[in-house]
Amino acid sequence: MKKIYLIAFSVLLLASCGKYNKALKSDDVDKKFTLAKEYYEIGIQEEKKSKLNKAIRLLEQIQPALKGKPQDEVVSYMIANAYYTIGDHFISGYRFDRYAKSFPDSPKIEEALYKSANSYFEVSPKYSLDQEDTHKAIDKLQFYVNAFEDGEFFKKANEQLAVLRDKLERKDYEVAKQLHHRRIWRPAIHALGNFIENHPGSKYNENAYFYKFESQYIYAVNSFRAIERERLEKAVEYYNDFVSKYPDSEFMEQAELHKKEIDDELYYLELLDL
């Protein structure tokens, strides 16, 4: 009995493959579309990549012949959604974006805009890498939430925007922090200052304020005597900024030690009349 089932399955499989291969070689657009639609619907319902890949290949074969025809909209959507469902988000992002631009009055426009944005969200890399796709995702998600305030994906899109913005924020912070940790003081001061200015409500700002102060302090005490006072006074300014904003900071003990050393150095410079 088991052999019978295996034989029957093999026959069906061969018949299915034969039908697909025959369609690939055919010039009959309607036949290709009918079979592609069958594969597509099964693939979507059962999340079968093999069926969707077959649908994609057939649909991409016939799409050029459908340009300017009503069926082009249907085929364009099916291709984009098939790529989206199999998780090929680089292509689905591009495909849905092109669909939205080509068919702005489509009843599926909201879905297309969100799925394009979500595709870029899915390919957004970790914070330490190039963030081009992150910026694209933010632009597209923001466009979606502006256009569809009552949209089906509005809440999720806003949550995704928060995730992506936090990623960019962390990247900016890590770049500035690394300058401090690598003891490149002057660029660190500049980068940390920019970070604070660009991200006024950041969860990293306590660290950023302290590292900015510490960078200025070390930069100052390693300066020539003629310019040390001015740089120390700037360090005092950054110290005051830090302690006024974070009086209970975990860095307070270290900050106070630096401040005492600054005061001692300023007193010494006063004695030298510099």
Model-derived regions: residue spans:
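Acidic, polar-rich low-complexity tracts and alpha-helical solenoid repeat scaffolds
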Residues: 5, 16-274
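Sec-dependent signal peptide recognition
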Residues: 2-8
